[in-house]
Amino acid sequence: MAYTGRALEVFLGTGTRFPRRIIWALGLIKYAAAKANAELGLIDGVRAEAIAKASLEVAEGLHDGKIVVDVFQTGSGTGVNMNVNEVIASRASQISGLTVHPNDHVNMSQSSNDVVPSAIRIALAYEVERSLLPALDRVIASLDSLASRTENVVKPGRTHLRDALPVTMGQEFSAYADAYRRARMLTEYTYKLLLDIPLGGTAVGTGLNAHPDYPRVAVSILREATGLDLKVASSKFRAMRLLSDIVAVSSAFKVLALDTWRLCQDLRLMYSGPNTGFNEIDIPQEVAGSSMMPGKVNPVTIEAVMQAASHVVGLDSSITMASLLGELELSMGIPLAGYVSLRQATLLTESFNKLAPLVLDRVKPNVERARMLAENSQALITVLAPIIGYDKASEISKAVYEGKGIREALREAGVPENLISKLLDIERLTKPGVPALERGG
């Protein structure tokens, strides 16, 4: 492995290896290339079959210990492409008993410049389709269930962290279910952009030194091998030069991360206490929260997810910078973009896989506590504003703030009992309309 040995000397040695899924994708590309080249009569059958078999072994992870180049290498990804070529060539030579050359045979009809951009797109698309979206669907289902379970649990609304009109807990959780549905639509749309791959573009997108039918044949084989709806890129020049589709996917990841961060922050606030915080929900935990304070239970899974979400947001900046690397015919941020985007997908998938069963499915509303807080909120006075006016309502609100009971303050202000009853019907206050102007009561 002459190239790989030299590469280890000149590339960085940070210990940052390519994700398993990218190596899987590279192995399948080499498999598809060998099969396509044989079908087009460009390579003898014995070598082609040996390369195909060795390539599948690489895809399956049997030679991961030999894929040793660092992510921080040449911007085209030539280092990892040649590392894989040399591993396959060595193994194919053993299988066939013939000399199999890493460039002449394994890399036939290819360049690092079309192979690695294709591999990182295939890897990311696969992870989104097969891992991230199912995990996200589980979170959405859990939020739907939680919203349904708490649809009649009234609690105080809060804006600016100050008392506001009452809402139901179900309304709050339904907001996040809807947000995740919209984020899912964005993620699904953007990841499908990755399915256009530049395989066959060779060095600069023209396809020089590749059979004219090679892209079609190779991508067809890859489509079957990966189970993804892959297509030859509408412009190989674009897909080799720009990483805009990966930037779009990372942006969708960022939206997911931000929505997740907000959900977790709200859960932490609602769980705060038990005696000096909101204490509106309980989340049974199975691990001690403090090494010093006995019996203290902290929202450990929630905080782990928030840290992962923060990392996803930060990694989006790396994707942005990686997309700017390069000039003219080729991006120079391909290895970094591949590594970082897969990392984002893994962080989100693992977060969702833990958030649904360990947090959302375990949330228990503290119904009486939440209702008590809602009934004692001075913001309830807002209901009377359409009748008594904003200024008079503000005076009553001030009296409540200074310690008077709501009912007492209303009576002293001359509010009729029927309006007081409407004001204190907090279930009604979580629905649209103008209760103070409604007949009856």
State what each model feature region is.
Residues 2-441:
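Conserved, well-structured ligand/cofactor-binding cores
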